[in-house]
Design a protein with these regions (language model features):
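Outer membrane beta-barrel
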Residues: 1-8, 107-113
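Transmembrane beta-barrel wall of Gram-negative outer-membrane proteins
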Residues: 44, 51-129, 138-142, 149-180
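Flexible, surface-exposed loop regions and adjacent strand-edge segments
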Residues: 26, 92-98, 128-138, 191-201
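A beta-strand signature from Gram-negative outer-membrane beta-barrel systems
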Residues: 3-48, 71, 88
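Short loop/turn segments at secondary-structure transitions that flank enzyme active sites
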Residues: 38-40, 119, 183
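Short intrinsically disordered, low-complexity coil segments enriched in acidic
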Residues: 1-4, 17, 32, 152-153, ...
Length: 202
């Protein structure tokens, strides 16, 4: 998922299994919290263009509005599109994302929801290179060359929805409940390469 839908990334150090549950690989330390964007008190309309070599152009539209007599309803929209050739030869990448953040805030309660869909497609992408047994580390290859052939590709789609509610029980105590779902679909034809001799064959 493209990061434009997030307001900030929080890195929480230390054990967090009691609060966030155990990760799939069983580690108990730390967590990364992705905070999605919300509409601010002032209207926001921001259009950002981007360019990356060799010829990848893109745009990002960020809109935020609040409605209601007390500005209690908020809408935040983020749309992203990038497409073109990368700095590596025979490599291209295309990214798109639409994300919608909705919220309602009252005197002592708040409700928010997020919906998003993102796609990530590319050709000729490099997945790393390992050394076969007995092969010494060679000099570094040219940084502008992809090890994978141009027909190697991946095509991924992410979809998700999140819902959260908060209630201020007292001035010092807040109760909350949150739920979410996500689905990732990935089609790929590529793999890591292995260097088999000093001549550079893999």
């Amino acid at each position: 998922t493209s990061p434009e839908m997030f307001e900030r990334v929080e890195v929480l150090k230390g054990p967090s299994a009691l609060l966030n549950g155990m990760p799939p690989k069983g580690s108990a330390g730390g967590a990364i919290n992705l905070v999605t964007k919300r509409a601010g008190d002032k209207p926001l309309t921001r259009l950002t263009g981007s360019y990356q070599s060799d010829s990848q152009f893109g745009g990002h539209l960020d809109l935020g509005r609040r409605f209601g007599d007390k500005q209690q309803f908020g809408v935040r929209f983020n749309g992203v599109y990038r497409d073109g050739d990368t700095a590596l030869k025979n490599q291209d990448k295309k990214v798109s994302q639409v994300a919608l953040g909705l919220d309602w805030r009252g005197e002592r309660a708040r409700v928010s929801a997020d919906l998003y869909r993102g796609t990530d497609m590319g050709h000729g992408l490099t997945r790393g290179l390992t050394l076969a047994t007995g092969v010494a580390v060679p000099r570094p290859p040219r940084p502008d060359v992809s090890w994978n052939p141009p027909w190697a590709y991946y095509d991924g789609t992410d979809r998700g929805a999140m819902l959260r509610g908060e209630l201020d029980v007292t001035d010092q105590l807040t109760a909350y409940v949150a739920a979410g779902t996500s689905k990732t679909e990935l089609e790929t034809l590529m793999g890591p390469g292995q260097l088999i001799n000093q001549a550079g064959d893999f």
